[in-house]
């Protein structure tokens, strides 16, 4: 099964990308993400997915728990996360099956994907920095994996000669 997932920058992009065939909209929310170009208000979040790819310090666990509660109230589709504390607290709110592990550059093998799937999350997003051959091998071994096929990716973390 193929799903087209789009990270939007502007709310005005939602309807046009849905009309073009997107199955899922991802939004960056203020205080939930460190990398989204545009950070929306939590009030804009309804029945979409959220990019929650920041790290939480020990003194921010109450903030994290409240953010997860807010997302549950808004019927979030998926939560893209990289900090394991998100998984830990999502269990208490029955949100684990909404989680997508997206640590940008760390998911590089079928074992990485299997580790998180065994914990009940929806799926993992493969690193966009691995080769096409590596990606194909993982896709042959594991079902329901997210692969970035277009867009701006974090190239500064790669040690490969990309340019």
List PLM regions with ranges.
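Residues lining hydrophobic/aromatic ligand-binding pockets adjacent to catalytic sites
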Residues: 118
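Active-site pocket-lining/capping segments in soluble small-molecule metabolic enzymes
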Residues: 1-115, 125-163
């Amino acid at each position: 099964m193929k799903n087209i997932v789009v990270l939007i920058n502007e709310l005005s992009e939602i309807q046009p990308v849905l009309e073009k065939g997107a199955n899922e909209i991802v939004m960056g929310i203020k205080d939930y993400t460190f990398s989204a170009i545009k950070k929306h208000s939590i009030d804009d979040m309804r029945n979409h997915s959220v990019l929650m790819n920041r790290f939480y310090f020990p003194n921010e666990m109450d903030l994290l728990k409240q953010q997860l509660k807010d997302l549950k109230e808004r019927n979030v589709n998926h939560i893209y996360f990289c900090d394991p504390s998100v998984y830990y607290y999502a269990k208490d709110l029955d949100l684990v099956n909404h989680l997508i592990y997206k640590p940008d550059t760390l998911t590089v093998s079928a074992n990485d994907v299997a580790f998180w799937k065994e914990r009940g999350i929806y799926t993992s997003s493969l690193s966009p920095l691995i080769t096409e051959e590596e990606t194909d091998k993982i896709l042959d071994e594991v079902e329901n994996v997210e692969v970035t096929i277009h867009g701006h990716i974090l190239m500064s973390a790669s040690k490969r000669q990309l340019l």
